[in-house]
């Protein structure tokens, strides 16, 4: 946490009052927020982040496949997104913190579509502590990547229909 706290202190010393988004360790997974595979769990380590302006948000990533790494087109279940986010959301509430889902995605199939919708609904229901989310990925370089939402030949990708009701 030394480097993160030094960066935050330097930003605040420069009189910047903006929100700072702080990622966790080990790909900053919501599913692994309490894991100690890489040493101290994010759930413990992130409590040592010091911001004189008290204006930090904790970022997690969460994919819906078996590895939680966005490595395949299969999703574990229709409720896996909310199940994997729940411990992180509880940590935010218990500690008076705010969070941000910096990466999430699911492929275009029935289970993943249900899981993405469930996760979006859960994030909206948790808006007291979750301040936003980003879908992975978009942009012309992704071509036919399973998670891209970049339109193909002017036609929206199927996942956009899932995301659209949650955009405001």
Predicted feature descriptions by range:
Residues 1-131, 148-153, 157, 162-164:
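Extracellular glycoside hydrolase catalytic/binding regions
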């Amino acid at each position: 946490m030394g480097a993160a706290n030094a960066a935050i202190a330097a930003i605040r010393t420069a009189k910047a009052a903006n929100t700072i988004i702080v990622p966790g360790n080990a790909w900053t997974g919501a599913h692994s927020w309490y894991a100690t595979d890489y040493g101290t769990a994010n759930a413990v380590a992130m409590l040592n982040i010091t911001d004189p302006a008290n204006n930090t948000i904790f970022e997690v990533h969460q994919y819906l496949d078996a590895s939680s790494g966005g490595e395949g087109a299969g999703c574990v279940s229709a409720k896996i997104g909310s199940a994997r986010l729940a411990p992180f959301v509880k940590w935010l509430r218990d500690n008076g913190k705010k969070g941000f889902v910096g990466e999430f995605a699911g492929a275009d199939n029935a289970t993943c579509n249900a899981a993405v919708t469930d996760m979006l609904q859960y994030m909206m229901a948790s808006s007291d502590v979750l301040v936003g989310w980003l879908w992975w990925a978009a942009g012309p370089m992704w071509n036919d990547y399973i998670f891209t939402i970049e339109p193909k030949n002017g036609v929206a990708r199927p996942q956009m229909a899932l995301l659209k009701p949650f955009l405001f």
